[in-house]
């Protein structure tokens, strides 16, 4: 989730603690490709993929290499399609799901402000790093960083309760509206469906 970004940037003012939620609120849709780097116990795993999300709670994440997995949500259920296992898991949305990094892109602003607080935004040269903390002590998410270059979002990095550090480097970012059909999961024939 880094490099060449298509910008609908914050106007020519500097991102800071006071205007970050306004910036996020102005972004109703996101489409991007990404490279996800997960670090745990000094080991690194790299996965490529794409993401589409909107503020109505809907999203679709397609992992391409080395995983072949799709995770999507229609705002009511979370769907996890594992092509290798030929299995679709359907999980109802629960409150625990709200404290995950995808919430930054899918929740309405009033809900986002209830769940998270902006700890700081620090700018060095052309990079701004905003630190976001969950309000709940029971959150899976410990700390989240939004990284901007010249006011364009380039990376989402977080640390979780499993001692993992995950960095989503965004590229080919597009903030333009898209149809819900683009994030609807189509279920291949012969897939086992598991309800949780």
Predicted region positions:
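Short, charged/polar low-complexity linear motifs in solvent-exposed/disordered segments
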Residues: 49, 78-80, 88-89, 97-99, ...
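Flexible, processing/modification-adjacent segments and terminal tails
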Residues: 13-38, 44, 82-142
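An acidic-aromatic
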Residues: 50-100, 166-167
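Gly/Pro-enriched, hydrophobic low-complexity segments
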Residues: 111-196
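Hydrophobic h-region of N-terminal signal peptides that target proteins for export
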Residues: 2-11
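N-terminal mature ectodomain segment of secretory-pathway/periplasmic proteins
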Residues: 16-19, 25-75
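Short hydrophobic/aromatic-rich beta-strand segments that constitute the beta-sheet cores
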Residues: 32-34, 59-63, 78-81, 132, ...
